[in-house]
Amino acid sequence: TEAAAVLLPTEMEIDENPKISVMFLSYGFSSVGPFREYIHIIHARFRGEEVGFVPHIFISNERGMLAGREREGYPKLLGDIDFDMHQPNVYGLITAQLSRPAGVVLVQGLFRPSEFLGEITADKPTVIKALGLRVVGSAVPGGPLSVCEFVPSALEFIAGEIWSGDGSLMFTGASEFSALHRLPIVGGVEATAFYNSSFRLRRPTKTYPFDA
Protein backbone atom coordinates (compact mmCIF):
# COMPACT_ATOMS: atom_id res chain seq x y z
CA THR A 1 0.00 0.00 0.00
CA GLU A 2 2.75 2.46 0.93
CA ALA A 3 4.64 1.79 -2.31
CA ALA A 4 1.53 2.61 -4.36
CA ALA A 5 0.59 5.63 -2.25
CA VAL A 6 3.98 7.24 -2.93
CA LEU A 7 3.17 7.30 -6.66
CA LEU A 8 -0.42 8.55 -6.36
CA PRO A 9 -1.54 12.19 -6.33
CA THR A 10 -3.10 13.16 -3.00
CA GLU A 11 -6.61 13.48 -4.46
CA MET A 12 -6.74 9.74 -5.20
CA GLU A 13 -7.63 6.93 -2.77
CA ILE A 14 -6.57 3.28 -2.66
CA ASP A 15 -7.50 0.18 -0.68
CA GLU A 16 -5.16 -1.80 1.52
CA ASN A 17 -2.91 -3.84 -0.81
CA PRO A 18 -4.43 -2.30 -3.95
CA LYS A 19 -4.77 -4.18 -7.21
CA ILE A 20 -2.01 -3.46 -9.71
CA SER A 21 -2.32 -4.32 -13.40
CA VAL A 22 0.37 -4.76 -16.04
CA MET A 23 -0.56 -4.72 -19.73
CA PHE A 24 1.56 -5.70 -22.71
CA LEU A 25 0.00 -4.55 -25.98
CA SER A 26 0.96 -5.00 -29.63
CA TYR A 27 -0.65 -2.61 -32.10
CA GLY A 28 -0.60 -3.99 -35.62
CA PHE A 29 -1.45 -0.60 -37.07
CA SER A 30 -2.50 2.82 -35.84
CA SER A 31 -2.39 6.51 -36.74
CA VAL A 32 1.27 6.53 -35.65
CA GLY A 33 2.13 3.19 -37.27
CA PRO A 34 2.66 -0.22 -35.62
CA PHE A 35 4.13 -0.30 -32.13
CA ARG A 36 4.18 -2.09 -28.77
CA GLU A 37 3.35 -0.75 -25.34
CA TYR A 38 3.71 -1.60 -21.65
CA ILE A 39 1.23 -0.04 -19.21
CA HIS A 40 1.48 -0.19 -15.40
CA ILE A 41 -1.79 0.65 -13.61
CA ILE A 42 -2.67 1.28 -9.95
CA HIS A 43 -6.38 0.71 -9.36
CA ALA A 44 -7.70 3.59 -7.27
CA ARG A 45 -10.65 5.93 -6.76
CA PHE A 46 -10.98 9.51 -7.92
CA ARG A 47 -13.98 11.48 -6.64
CA GLY A 48 -15.73 8.21 -5.83
CA GLU A 49 -15.18 6.60 -9.24
CA GLU A 50 -13.01 3.55 -9.90
CA VAL A 51 -10.12 4.46 -12.21
CA GLY A 52 -6.64 3.30 -13.07
CA PHE A 53 -3.72 5.66 -12.44
CA VAL A 54 -0.74 5.11 -14.72
CA PRO A 55 2.64 5.71 -13.01
CA HIS A 56 4.70 3.89 -15.66
CA ILE A 57 4.14 3.49 -19.38
CA PHE A 58 6.65 2.52 -22.07
CA ILE A 59 6.22 2.55 -25.82
CA SER A 60 8.32 1.53 -28.82
CA ASN A 61 7.19 4.41 -31.04
CA GLU A 62 8.37 8.03 -30.73
CA ARG A 63 5.26 9.64 -32.26
CA GLY A 64 3.02 7.67 -29.94
CA MET A 65 5.15 8.69 -26.97
CA LEU A 66 4.90 12.40 -27.75
CA ALA A 67 1.15 12.30 -28.37
CA GLY A 68 0.42 10.45 -25.14
CA ARG A 69 2.57 12.74 -23.01
CA GLU A 70 1.36 16.05 -24.42
CA ARG A 71 -2.34 15.23 -24.80
CA GLU A 72 -3.32 12.78 -22.04
CA GLY A 73 -0.52 13.45 -19.57
CA TYR A 74 0.77 9.88 -19.45
CA PRO A 75 4.45 9.62 -18.44
CA LYS A 76 5.41 7.74 -21.61
CA LEU A 77 9.02 6.73 -22.16
CA LEU A 78 10.63 4.88 -25.03
CA GLY A 79 11.43 1.25 -24.30
CA ASP A 80 12.37 -1.99 -26.02
CA ILE A 81 9.31 -4.28 -25.85
CA ASP A 82 9.30 -7.90 -27.00
CA PHE A 83 5.71 -9.17 -27.26
CA ASP A 84 4.10 -11.17 -30.07
CA MET A 85 1.09 -13.43 -29.41
CA HIS A 86 1.58 -15.08 -32.80
CA GLN A 87 5.17 -16.16 -32.09
CA PRO A 88 5.20 -19.97 -31.80
CA ASN A 89 7.37 -21.82 -29.30
CA VAL A 90 7.70 -25.43 -28.15
CA TYR A 91 6.43 -24.59 -24.65
CA GLY A 92 3.01 -23.28 -25.69
CA LEU A 93 3.66 -20.05 -23.81
CA ILE A 94 3.23 -16.40 -24.70
CA THR A 95 6.26 -14.39 -23.62
CA ALA A 96 6.58 -10.67 -22.95
CA GLN A 97 9.56 -8.56 -21.98
CA LEU A 98 10.31 -4.89 -21.34
CA SER A 99 13.86 -3.54 -21.51
CA ARG A 100 15.25 -0.02 -21.14
CA PRO A 101 17.76 0.38 -22.65
CA ALA A 102 17.88 -2.69 -24.88
CA GLY A 103 19.57 -5.52 -23.01
CA VAL A 104 18.59 -4.28 -19.53
CA VAL A 105 15.44 -6.28 -18.76
CA LEU A 106 12.99 -4.59 -16.38
CA VAL A 107 9.96 -6.89 -16.62
CA GLN A 108 9.42 -10.47 -17.79
CA GLY A 109 6.03 -12.09 -18.23
CA LEU A 110 4.70 -15.51 -19.26
CA PHE A 111 1.15 -16.55 -20.12
CA ARG A 112 -0.15 -20.09 -20.63
CA PRO A 113 -3.63 -19.99 -22.19
CA SER A 114 -6.14 -22.52 -20.90
CA GLU A 115 -9.75 -21.56 -21.65
CA PHE A 116 -11.63 -19.46 -24.20
CA LEU A 117 -14.06 -17.28 -22.23
CA GLY A 118 -15.94 -15.53 -25.02
CA GLU A 119 -16.00 -12.78 -27.60
CA ILE A 120 -15.70 -9.05 -27.10
CA THR A 121 -18.31 -7.15 -29.12
CA ALA A 122 -19.20 -3.51 -29.68
CA ASP A 123 -22.50 -4.17 -27.88
CA LYS A 124 -20.68 -5.56 -24.84
CA PRO A 125 -17.28 -3.82 -24.83
CA THR A 126 -14.59 -4.23 -22.18
CA VAL A 127 -13.62 -0.80 -20.86
CA ILE A 128 -10.46 0.09 -18.94
CA LYS A 129 -10.69 3.57 -17.41
CA ALA A 130 -7.50 5.48 -16.80
CA LEU A 131 -6.44 8.82 -15.38
CA GLY A 132 -3.38 10.78 -16.43
CA LEU A 133 -1.80 13.78 -14.71
CA ARG A 134 -0.91 16.38 -17.34
CA VAL A 135 1.75 18.83 -16.16
CA VAL A 136 3.32 21.70 -18.11
CA GLY A 137 5.97 23.70 -16.31
CA SER A 138 6.39 27.44 -16.30
CA ALA A 139 8.66 29.10 -18.85
CA VAL A 140 9.87 31.26 -15.96
CA PRO A 141 12.33 29.44 -13.66
CA GLY A 142 10.66 28.85 -10.31
CA GLY A 143 7.29 30.03 -11.60
CA PRO A 144 3.98 28.24 -11.02
CA LEU A 145 2.99 25.37 -13.27
CA SER A 146 1.31 26.49 -16.48
CA VAL A 147 -0.89 23.36 -16.54
CA CYS A 148 -1.61 20.80 -13.82
CA GLU A 149 -4.73 18.74 -14.40
CA PHE A 150 -6.13 15.23 -14.31
CA VAL A 151 -7.08 13.91 -17.76
CA PRO A 152 -9.53 10.97 -17.86
CA SER A 153 -9.57 8.57 -20.79
CA ALA A 154 -10.41 4.93 -21.44
CA LEU A 155 -9.50 1.98 -23.64
CA GLU A 156 -12.73 0.55 -25.03
CA PHE A 157 -12.16 -2.94 -26.47
CA ILE A 158 -14.87 -3.62 -29.07
CA ALA A 159 -13.74 -6.89 -30.72
CA GLY A 160 -11.60 -9.93 -30.03
CA GLU A 161 -11.39 -13.07 -27.93
CA ILE A 162 -10.93 -13.31 -24.16
CA TRP A 163 -8.74 -16.13 -22.84
CA SER A 164 -8.00 -17.11 -19.27
CA GLY A 165 -4.83 -18.87 -18.24
CA ASP A 166 -1.88 -19.01 -15.88
CA GLY A 167 0.48 -16.07 -15.62
CA SER A 168 3.95 -15.41 -14.29
CA LEU A 169 5.35 -11.91 -13.82
CA MET A 170 8.71 -10.73 -12.53
CA PHE A 171 10.18 -7.27 -11.98
CA THR A 172 13.94 -7.70 -12.21
CA GLY A 173 15.05 -4.58 -10.35
CA ALA A 174 17.85 -4.23 -12.89
CA SER A 175 17.64 -0.43 -13.08
CA GLU A 176 16.94 2.30 -10.53
CA PHE A 177 16.41 4.67 -13.45
CA SER A 178 13.19 2.79 -14.30
CA ALA A 179 12.29 1.38 -10.90
CA LEU A 180 9.15 -0.60 -11.68
CA HIS A 181 10.14 -3.08 -8.97
CA ARG A 182 9.23 -0.53 -6.31
CA LEU A 183 5.64 -1.68 -6.81
CA PRO A 184 6.26 -5.24 -5.57
CA ILE A 185 4.09 -8.28 -6.25
CA VAL A 186 2.67 -9.33 -2.87
CA GLY A 187 -0.17 -11.67 -3.90
CA GLY A 188 -1.25 -14.02 -6.63
CA VAL A 189 -1.04 -13.14 -10.32
CA GLU A 190 -4.26 -13.26 -12.34
CA ALA A 191 -3.76 -13.42 -16.10
CA THR A 192 -6.07 -12.72 -19.03
CA ALA A 193 -5.34 -12.37 -22.75
CA PHE A 194 -7.26 -10.38 -25.35
CA TYR A 195 -6.53 -11.98 -28.73
CA ASN A 196 -7.07 -10.34 -32.15
CA SER A 197 -8.75 -7.47 -30.36
CA SER A 198 -9.70 -4.01 -31.56
CA PHE A 199 -10.23 -0.98 -29.38
CA ARG A 200 -10.83 2.72 -29.52
CA LEU A 201 -9.56 5.43 -27.21
CA ARG A 202 -12.24 7.35 -25.39
CA ARG A 203 -11.03 10.93 -25.33
CA PRO A 204 -11.87 13.20 -22.38
CA THR A 205 -14.85 15.55 -22.37
CA LYS A 206 -13.49 17.49 -19.38
CA THR A 207 -10.39 17.73 -17.21
CA TYR A 208 -9.94 18.32 -13.48
CA PRO A 209 -7.52 20.94 -12.11
CA PHE A 210 -5.03 19.69 -9.53
CA ASP A 211 -3.22 21.96 -7.09
CA ALA A 212 0.17 20.30 -6.89
Describe these PLM feature segments.
Residues 11-16, 55, 66-68, 171-173:
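N-terminal start-of-chain detector that recognizes signal peptides
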Residues 1-37, 170, 184, 196-198, ...:
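N-terminal domain-onset segments
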Residues 1-2, 18-22, 35, 60-61, ...:
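A short linear-motif detector with a strong N-terminal bias
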Residues 68-212:
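Interaction-surface and assembly-scaffold signal
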Residues 19, 37-41, 54, 78-80, ...:
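Broad gene-expression machinery/nucleic-acid interaction feature
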